[in-house]
């Protein structure tokens, strides 16, 4: 059964150019499973529940695939980390440019109410198979490696993780902000 996970595609000309630059399409031909983490970004009630303030209905479709990836990573000895979008006093104070200029006052208030720690919107989506050994890390900006959050980089380094599989609610927002930062941090 084929499942359409998202509507993104890469033009064949871009794939060819990248392949020529790298000497092949794949960045890694093999993964060391014990040094690999599955980073699950923003699969939370505030993004996924029907009628939620920041609902992205399409994200519900990827849950079975995310669960399969998480289980495969665990079975191979890797780590699963759930990243939670967090709006709290620190986020509002340290990312005022976003909250004051990119959000209307009404939208800002909705986000403040939807994503504080412990709120319904902050909770991991119940369809995800979260195990006690999995980690949960809060983020206060689009990227999981951005400032003013627990240092995901240090958490991963302490566990000798150097390879990430990133899945999440919005490929073109928080996943895309997380991936290049991870690469830049090696």
Regions flagged by a language model, labelled:
Residues 1-135:
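Active-site acidic carboxylates
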Residues 117-167:
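Internal catalytic-core helix/loop-beta-alpha segment
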Residues 84-86, 140, 169:
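Short, well-ordered beta-to-alpha junction loops that form the rim of enzyme active sites
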Residues 175-185:
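Short Gly/Thr/Asp-enriched flexible loops that form oxyanion-binding sites at enzyme active sites
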Residues 170-174:
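Gly/Ser/Thr-rich loops at beta-strand to alpha-helix junctions
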Residues 76-78, 160, 186:
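Glycine-centered short loops/turns at secondary-structure junctions
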